């Protein structure tokens, strides 16, 4: 079993930022959402808010999109090309994707790529607000251990040292910089 981060690891860029920018072009994003997100982000810097609070404000406009599933499919029609070739060439059936990105846009691309095991930030279907914790760092591993209690992780891949908990549970770990895989020595 191999475990992968998504953004800047197997996806070239940050899918959340790309999704937001795509939304700005294709859908009316309320300025109010952006301003509230900026305020919450400043509050996060000072320890008043968490990243989930920022995401809740930033993606509040999603509840106004009439056919969100279609909108997400159209987004992936344009952005699927950002999946890195090295991943597609090495993909295995038991891969596990673990990402802080939201299920709203992660599940559809995983379905397209036939990735069956996905751990990501969960959102309420109606309100589009985040349920529980942002899926990052140790939170990823807590969920992973519940889903796969006796897993034997061969390789872990991430672009960030915030994913050290992923590296700690794997035999081999790789830092991903663009298309270059750098063996991480534990």
Language model region names:
Residues 71, 76-186:
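C-terminal cap/substrate-recognition subdomain and adjoining C-terminal extension
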